[in-house]
Amino acid sequence: MTDFSKILDKARELEAKMKESQEKIKQIEVVGSSGGDAVKVTLNGDGEMTNIHLSEEILKEEKGIIQDLITAAHNNAKSQLKSKTSEEISKA
């Protein structure tokens, strides 16, 4: 086998691993929370918000507090997603 053939084989192998990682990343789901779990935000592997949960107690709070808690929960989920995505890519 020539050096060029070895390089091509390695490239194909790496491409297959990256595609596999991308598929696994799409399956990731993370839940970020804030306010002692009063607010929970779920993100999928593409970073899209798929769910938001607000406890009954939190709905009694002022609008600004609720907005801050939603933002914090989203940022928490985004941080988790970034970590899990990096972890998955490093396996490739």
Where are these regions (language model features)?
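Long amphipathic alpha-helical segments used for membrane anchoring, targeting, substrate engagement
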Residues: 1-31, 79-92
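Generic, ordered loop/turn and secondary-structure boundary motif
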Residues: 2-5, 26, 55, 59-60, ...
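Residue-level signature of catalytic and energy-coupling elements of molecular machines
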Residues: 11, 47, 70
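N-terminal intrinsically disordered, cationic/polar leader segments
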Residues: 31-52, 58-61
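Short, charged/polar low-complexity linear motifs in solvent-exposed/disordered segments
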Residues: 33, 58, 67-69, 84
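Juxtamembrane/interface motifs at transmembrane-helix termini
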Residues: 36, 71, 86-89
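Short, well-ordered alpha-helical segments
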Residues: 62, 66-81
